């Protein structure tokens, strides 16, 4: 039986690969997509997500979400993804529109209609998820688990200690990590290992139409290079759903720093149990890189 999932995203070049995997992995049933401000503005992430759904002729409802963090000024990652978020490929014009509901209400309604609890996957800032949990607490029993790309048990990528998705809205992340729902965190500890090699990247134009499109986008992606390999951060959250055997997880207490002058957005991961607090997150720490690369090749070959 396919696993029903809702995907919250901020496309973003590596988001495009994660969305492809969510659509074409035969083990998954992507039922709803929502967008959030992150890599670029929410207007741009929504446009990019609709372009991708049209490209793959995927009839999946999409709702636009939060345009700003809960309490902070927005930040973005245009330096990594380009000003549009997905520069490099000329997508065909379309007439698709997002749902009228804001993202967190669309998630609420879809959860309440679902016949069984649903897995939420969040690969951008956690603003929409925090709004859902704070404004609609009745939804919690309907969430099977939350799988995120975000955080780090060590170094950051937008500050010395903080990963971008968490640092973009630390208050939202803190709300989510305190919520009591089951969380799997695929942070930089594994996503920095999730590299597609130059040899594989060179085969993409001949793979299929998705390969051609991704190859064009990758030429504008700044998380690595076509010559040294590219890190597929967001794809790790989808990979864990399908191939959890590729990941080594450890249950840990995780809190989010919201006050520090230099540490705001840091995920404080208590790997050794120093704080004596019960674990609230399953933290991914290691990745079978070759197995991951093989799985990526298999799923993208299906993305026609």
From Swiss-Prot:
Entry keywords, A to Z: Glycosidase, Hydrolase
Active site per the UniProt annotation: 233
Assigned EC number: 3.2.-.-
GO CC annotations, alphabetized: cytosol
Entries under CDD domains matching the protein: nuc_hydro_IU_UC_XIUA
GO MF annotation list: purine nucleosidase activity; uridine nucleosidase activity
Keyword Metal-binding: no
One Pfam match: IU_nuc_hydro
GO biological process: purine nucleobase metabolic process; purine nucleoside catabolic process; pyrimidine nucleobase metabolic process
EC top class, as a word: hydrolase
Gene3D superfamilies: Ribonucleoside hydrolase-like (3.90.245.10)
Record-stated family: Belongs to the IUNH family. RihC subfamily.
HAMAP family, alphabetized: Nucleosid_hydro_RihC
Chain's role: Hydrolyzes both purine and pyrimidine ribonucleosides with a broad-substrate specificity.
PANTHER family reported for this sequence: INOSINE-URIDINE PREFERRING NUCLEOSIDE HYDROLASE, NON-SPECIFIC RIBONUCLEOSIDE HYDROLASE RIHC
Protein name listed in UniProt: Non-specific ribonucleoside hydrolase RihC
Lineage of the species this protein comes from: Bacteria, Pseudomonadati, Pseudomonadota, Gammaproteobacteria, Enterobacterales
